[in-house]
Amino acid sequence: MADAEVKARVEQVYREDSRRILATLIRLLGDFDLAEEALHEAFFVAVERWQRDGVPDNPRTWLVSAGRFKAIDVLRRRARFKASRPWLLAQVEELEQAQWSDDDVEDDRLRLMFTCCHPALAADAQVPLTLREVCDLTTEEIARAFLCAPATIAQRIVRAKAKIRDAKIPYQVPSLSELPERLDSVLRVIYLVFNEGYSASDGAQVVREDLTREAIRLGRLLMELLPEPEVMGLLALMLLHESRRAARTSPEGELILLENQDRTRWDAQLIAEGGALVERALTTRRFGPYCLQAAIAAVHAEAPMADETDWAQIVGLYDVLLRVTPSPVIELNRAVAVAKRDGALAGLTLIEGILERGELQDYHLAHSARAEFCRQLGRTDEARTAYARALELTRQAPERRFIEGRLRELG
């Protein structure tokens, strides 16, 4: 195989499997930083070895093995320099005898997720740590999701890693009796991963398919472990949103708003699966925020045309959702639904009230929504100002182009 082909294959494996491999190395090594070092060393070696020997039949297993041996070398060097610490040699022996299978590599991401969401960790560190280690989001991407400073996120992640190492927090999926109390954090992580994939906060594309696929895969794994209503609701929500992926952008990569999408391009199979999960979850009458959001998505999916959407039902569902989970972002979404039901002025009044409280001043979608309703009402100067503020806050290229187009239309 030519050098360029090998390098391309290594890059592909890194994109698709590096976080799975890292999760297994963290389980084997019990040390995030050592596992990260071993991972990168393994991929570095792969470029040379695969050019010489060919790409192995199972690249993931090969890379786990290579990473393990690199870690053993590091630990042996540490043991020589720290002869007074015999536990290092014991760690080397334990690592040399460690066994794993390719199935472990799949399951280890779920194990790592539960470890990162362990109740012994600070609540404000659990989700950022999981997004960083399990899903490879950067601290900047995580900070944007939490509307806070990257340095703050980085500090939380460092402290959480140290806590896992020092407290020897177990690397395992909890027992069935422990699962329910550990569920909320894990659901939140999967939801944030999907959201970052469904509407990437940065970059040249609207969607990051690697993240949406991974979130759905983890949701399905969680359903097998614990088929609770909120697990069903989250999986349904992701499937219903994913069903619209093909229609959300033009062939040129331009953003298409929901009301302008070609609904014949929506995935009927995903809609059917998601809708069935919503019905199943709601019949339990033990539903929460994910079930309610999935129910809203299902109402959208049921409408054959945008102007046939049951906005009254959607507003009603948002009313219930706000009682269950008060949130300014949910208020914003409800305001948009109210505008669809009662007119742009009704929605704009609600959005301006939210912005006056200051909670969404740095949230680009709030300013975009305000701009759109000002535009519809002929308040051109206000629309232009709001779109300009949204543009300042937007990093994703298709969203920026969409806003720039609106500004050009306004003159």
What is each PLM-predicted segment?
Residues 78, 85-124, 130-141, 148-319:
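Amphipathic helix-loop-helix modules that constitute alpha-helical solenoid scaffolds
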